[in-house]
Each structure stands twice: as structure tokens, then as C-alpha cells.
Amino acid sequence: SEHWQLFNNNEVLFNEARTAQAATVVFSLQQNAQIEPLARSIHTLRRQRGSAMKILVRENTASLRATDERLLLACGANMVIPWNAPLSRCLTMIESVQGQKFSRYVPEDITTLLSMTQPLKLRGFQKWDVFCNAVNNMMNNPLLPAHGKGVLVALRPVPGIRVEQALTLCRPNRTGDIMTIGGNRLVLFLSCLLYTS
């Protein structure tokens, strides 16, 4: 369409959007590592460009947790389009925000939002004491919803497989997913995951 413009990446899109007023901006989310930089870009645009701009995030692979989505929305995104939405649904969702004004409050300081929604900065194998301390801190964080702090899973390997061997099969790619070994079990903590997920 003559009304659409495609950009090479989110950074180029962000720089172009900094001069727009009531444009519709659709960021692309490819991987979990993009969440914080994308949140910062969204926060900046919303604070600088105001409520007429429509800011959407199109998730291209399953990489968002509920807290990640809450962060993007709290930073000023109008909507997050899930990775499994077909193109026709995606276009309908983009169309649905046209004419809307963003009405939610966006705090001036993004660090409050980041610390509230992304409190655990660890990933992968942790020593037992570090693991226990991290899980305890998450469970006692009053800023996270009670049902969304995380899920703790203890796995016992099948006979003939040592727990250390099972550990080599775990490759978490999300910050906040940690694991340890204890009591001949592989213990995983998937942070900020809803029980229903």
C-alpha cells in the first residue's frame, strides 16, 4: 500500500518515528533479547510523541511471557500482536487501533518499569545457593502478581541417566530461566511464567 513504509530494522523505524505525530508504528520482535531495548524505544516514543501515535509490537516467534507483554504495554505500546496471529488477523488488529488515543499513564522513568517486570537477570545453571536466593527473591517480590512469579519444576532423570547428563540438555534462552542440581534432581525455575502457560 502507498500508506505503508517498510524499514530494515527496529532502530531505523524508531529513528524515523521520532519525527512522526499520529503514525502507526509496528515494531518486530524476533527474540527475547530485544525486549528491553524495544521497551526503551517504545517508552521514548510514547513520552516524546504523545497519545496520537499508535505503537504496536508484532511478535514473530514465541518469545514473550506475560510480564514481557505487560512491560511493553506499560511502556506505551497500544497492542502486542501474538506470533501465531495469521496475516489477516494481524492486519485487522492494526486497523482496530486507528483513530484511538493512548490513555494509559506512562511513568517518566523507565527503570521503575524494568525493575518491576524483569527482576531476575540470571539465566542457565546456577549454584544451589544462588538458585535458592534468586527464587526466594522472586517469590517475595511484591511488584509481581502472585500467580505470575514463576514455576518451579523438579525433574528426576530416567534410570541410567545421571542428573548431570540431563543438565546438558537444558538450554534456556530466556533471561530468568535458571536451573540447578540438588537431591539427584534437575530443578528448573521459569521466572515470570503463569501457571497456565
Residue spans of the language-model regions?
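Conserved small/polar residues in nucleotide/adenosyl-binding loops
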Residues: Y195-T196
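Alpha4 helix (beta4-alpha4-beta5 surface) of REC/receiver domains from two-component response regulators
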Residues: A62-N78
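Conserved phosphotransfer microenvironments
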Residues: A17-R49, R58
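CheY-like receiver
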Residues: F102-N141, H147
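A short, well-structured beta->alpha microelement
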Residues: E2-Q21, N32-I35, N133-M138
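Short beta-strand->loop micro-motif that forms the acidic, two-metal-ion catalytic signature
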Residues: I181-C192
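Catalytic-site or vestigial catalytic-site microsegments of nucleotide-handling domains
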Residues: N133-R162, N184
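C-terminal output helix
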Residues: A85-M93
